[in-house]
Structure formats: structure tokens, C-alpha cells
UniProtKB/Swiss-Prot annotation:
A lipid is attached at C19 (S-diacylglycerol cysteine). The Vlp and Vsp proteins are antigenically distinct proteins, only one vlp or vsp gene is transcriptionally active at any one time. Switching between these genes is a mechanism of host immune response evasion. Genes for both Vlp and Vsp families are on (usually) unnamed linear plasmids in B.hermsii HS1. It is a lipid-anchor. The keyword Signal applies. A lipid is attached at C19 (N-palmitoyl cysteine). Residues 1-18 form the signal peptide. This is Variable large protein 14. Belongs to the variable large protein (Vlp) family. Beta subfamily. Pfam families: Lipoprotein_2. InterPro entries: Borrelia_lipo. PROSITE patterns: PROKAR_LIPOPROTEIN.
Length: 360
């Protein structure tokens, strides 16, 4: 009888112990999941903050109205710097988030690595954009206190070749990074050629070897107004600066040649397309040195054309940069969505791997 009672008591003890262990295990599992969810909330909040950081950092720096008539070329540099600073802040915050993700509790290791990989990839893209923007800002800063659309009632002067080449290279770099990030870079509508038949035609204000004729500046402004910004960017992306080129009247010149070639015709020189002419105006307005030409009392129209051309280029560049940033942040967001719960922590896995096998 005593043996029977002892057996019953032992059984009850084992059942109670088992229940207690099960409850403790369930409690630990619940705590682990709560810790995991808390980590997810923290990561999600940090990521949402980053989405707003870039927009807040650059504020109202929208390229289509970045500069106005009367502004100095240094203003263009300030615009590039502001966007570059915003990207730097975003990149730094991403790196902070990467550290927080590494500390996430009870998260599946492979899903965490996927997020960190996406962050590293985005940081690399942002660094390339920052480098390009820093160089562009430097070119504009070097141009200094000269008016955007600097002009004279005399022969036009070619722009600094090195400065124009640096602008072309910076824009190329941004487009290349964006293209590799899956951003659609449109070709736009380049329009037809712009002839230089008289000194009253639009090309005279850009590249005449004497004072441009009456109303040439108004015609130049009209050409810039109708130019497709995407086509202008495309022409800059494929532009080549002229090396010792004396511009003639009949060759179909591209944007880089029109901006840096030596004016050699009273009527200016023919532009291959409307977009080439407008892009050349932008390049000439952004780089150091050189002048546009105008008839008496028409300098205001030249400056308006230059400002419009610059704003079109900056506007499309800003759009491309924003799309590139958004594309890379979206990739991180998708990776964050894929973070999975794991009952095995990194410490557990390490301890398990370090355990020595028993021998008999």
C-alpha cells in the first residue's frame, strides 16, 4: 500500500514538475516574441524616420526654381551642397539603423543579414551621389560671384573647358548611379536643329564673335523655354567639350562644343537640336568664365534664358536623385518586412556550436 501511495505521489510530482516546466517555457517563448516585436517596432520607427530625413534635410531645394535672375553662380553650388548634405545625413542615419538591427533580439540571422546588405548597398549608392554633388558644388563655387548668364554687348566668350567637363562628368555620374538603381532616365524630345542664319537668331546670343543682333536674346529665351528638360540632360550626358575648336556656322554642334568652342561667326553657330542649344546655355551659365552676347539693353533676356536653362537641368537632376534615394530605401523597406522571428538567439547558436561532444 505504501509503495502504491509513493508511486502515486511520485507521478503527481512529475506531472506538476512537467506542467511547471511547460509554463516556464511558454513564458520564456512569449517574452522572446515580445522582445522580437519590440525590436521590430524600433527598427520600423527608425526606418520611417529615415524616409523623412532626406526630405527634411533638403527642405524646399527643388531644382526647377533653385535660382533666379540676378543670382550668382555660387547659388548653384549652394543648391548642390544642400542636397549632398541631406544625403550625408540620410547615409549616417542608415548606418545607425544598421547597428540597431544587429542588436535585434530573437530575429532570424539570415533575414537580418539581408537588411544589412540592403543598407550597405544603399550607403554605397548615396556615397557615389555625394561625391558627384560635391564635385558639382566645387565647380559652381569656383565660378564664384559672377552672375548666372554673365553677358556683354560684345562678342560671346567660350566657357572654361575644365569647368564644363567637370559639370558633364558630375551629371554623368549621377545618371549612371540612378540607372544602375533602376531609375528610368528618359531621352525626352530633343527637337530640331537651330540655325544660325543671321545675327538676330538665337545662336548669336550664345556664340557670336561680335555683339548679337536685336531680339537674338529673346529668341534664345524662347528656345530654352520650349526645350524638354529630359532631352537637355540627355544631351549633357553625351556631351563632349571642344578642344581648340573654332565654331563655324553650318556644323551641327552639340551642347559641349557650343559651350566651350571659340566663337568664330557673327551669327553664332548652328545647334544640332533645340535641346543641345538649351543644354549649352545651361553649361555656359554654370561654369567659370565666358560670356553671352546681347544687343543694347537686352542683357535681361539673356540672364532669364540662362536661369531658365539652369533650373531645368537642376530640376531633372533633383528628380533623378530623389527617385534613386527612394528606390534604394524601398529595397531596405522590403528587406525589413522580411525579418523573421527565431527562437534560437545568436548567443544560443554560438554556445551550441561551442559545446563539446560527449564520449562514452
Amino acid at each position: 500500500m505504501r509503495k502504491r501511495i509513493s508511486a502515486i505521489i511520485m507521478t503527481l510530482f512529475m506531472v506538476l514538475a512537467s506542467c511547471s516546466n511547460q509554463l516556464e517555457a511558454e513564458k520564456l517563448a512569449a517574452e522572446s516574441k515580445n522582445t522580437f516585436f519590440d525590436s521590430l517596432v524600433k527598427i520600423g520607427q527608425g526606418f520611417q524616420d529615415i524616409f523623412g530625413i532626406f526630405g527634411n534635410a533638403i527642405g524646399d531645394a527643388l531644382g526647377f526654381n533653385a535660382v533666379k535672375s540676378g543670382d550668382k553662380k555660387s547659388k548653384i553650388g549652394e543648391h548642390f551642397k544642400k542636397i549632398g548634405d541631406g544625403l550625408t545625413t540620410t547615409k549616417d542615419k542608415l548606418n545607425e539603423l544598421s547597428g540597431e538591427i544587429s542588436e535585434a533580439k530573437n530575429a532570424n540571422g539570415s533575414s537580418i543579414e539581408a537588411v544589412k546588405s540592403a543598407i550597405n548597398s544603399a550607403s554605397d549608392v548615396f556615397e557615389q551621389l555625394i561625391t558627384a554633388l560635391t564635385k558639382l558644388a566645387g565647380v559652381a563655387k569656383e565660378a564664384g560671384s559672377t552672375d548666372i548668364g554673365d553677358t556683354a554687348s560684345a562678342a560671346a566668350l567660350a566657357r572654361d573647358k575644365d569647368g564644363v567637363e567637370a559639370i558633364i562628368a558630375g551629371i554623368k555620374a549621377i545618371i549612371d548611379v540612378a540607372d544602375k538603381s533602376g531609375v528610368n532616365i528618359e531621352k525626352g524630345n530633343a527637337g530640331g536643329p537651330v540655325n544660325a542664319a543671321a545675327n538676330t537668331d538665337a545662336p548669336a546670343a550664345l556664340a557670336a564673335n561680335a555683339a548679337a543682333g536685336a531680339n537674338s536674346t529673346a529668341k534664345l529665351a524662347a528656345e530654352v523655354t520650349k526645350a524638354d528638360p529630359w532631352a537637355m540632360i540627355d544631351k549633357i550626358n553625351s556631351a563632349k567639350a571642344a578642344v581648340g575648336v573654332q565654331l563655324d556656322a553650318n556644323t551641327n554642334y552639340g551642347a559641349g562644343e557650343l559651350a566651350t568652342g571659340t566663337p568664330n561667326q557673327a551669327n553664332g553657330s548652328k545647334a544640332a537640336t533645340n535641346a543641345d542649344l538649351a543644354a549649352a546655355v545651361a553649361l555656359k551659365a554654370m561654369a567659370k568664365g565666358g560670356k553671352f552676347s546681347h544687343a543694347a539693353n537686352e542683357d535681361g533676356a539673356v540672364k532669364a534664358a540662362a536661369v531658365s536653362a539652369v533650373n531645368k537641368v537642376l530640376g531633372v537632376l533633383d528628380f533623378i536623385i530623389r527617385k534613386t534615394v527612394s528606390s534604394n530605401l524601398d529595397k531596405i523597406r522590403e528587406a525589413v518586412k522580411g525579418i523573421k522571428y527565431s527562437e534560437i538567439t545568436e548567443t544560443d547558436a554560438t554556445e551550441s556550436g561551442d559545446a563539446q561532444p560527449t564520449t562514452k
